[in-house]
């Protein structure tokens, strides 16, 4: 859990993914298209990835454990939450408040 929280605070937006996950790619692409330089951490490329995956599952309280997005060091959620925030017009203000967007 400590490693997840440490990584989550390294940048304004941190996304935990799996390289083979299509929804992870979709969420990562959304942030890229918005102009956000997110830190993408692929759990299947990390020797401690399984341990972090379990920690993320514990934080979320449900599965699937990826993608998981942190904004401003705070857990926001997975695909459904990010898409809901985006469609509701709440994601961009959240990104601006975290310093991930300047426009």
Swiss-Prot record:
Pfam family, one: Glutaredoxin
Annotated ranges, domain Glutaredoxin: 1-102
UniProt key word NAD: no
Coiled coil: none
SS bonds (residue pairs): 21-24
Keywords: Cytoplasm, Disulfide bond, Electron transport, Nucleus, Redox-active center, Transport
UniProt keyword annotation of RNA-binding present: no
Positions of short motif Responsive for interaction with TGA factors: 100-103
CDD domains reported for this sequence: GRX_GRXh_1_2_like
Subcellular location(s) per record: Cytoplasm; Nucleus
GO CC term (a single one): nucleus
Function: Has a glutathione-disulfide oxidoreductase activity in the presence of NADPH and glutathione reductase. Reduces low molecular weight disulfides and proteins.
Similarity section: Belongs to the glutaredoxin family. CC-type subfamily.
Protein name listed in UniProt: Putative glutaredoxin-C14
Record organism: Oryza sativa subsp. japonica
